[in-house]
Amino acid sequence: MIYNLYSIYDKDAKEFGPLFNAKNALIASRYVEQMLNEVKNVDPYAVYRMGEYDTEKGIIDSTVSFVGDCSELLKNHEEC
């Protein structure tokens, strides 16, 4: 099975947080909403797809791509 790997980037600290996996960007945004539920200002945070993890082959493809700023992702998620 292929899992997408994501991380939250802290623009102020200039570093990525721990990896988490999700089926797609929509599911990842739900996880982000839960993780940042207590944070008052989500503007300094963004979500990146860090790559894929193939559980059958044990291979990680580390192609990094920007998913979106947390403020926009959470706003779009609330509208769904």
Can you name each region flagged by the protein language model?
Residues 1-15:
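Short aromatic-glycine-(Arg/Gly/Cys) micro-motifs in beta-strand/loop hairpins
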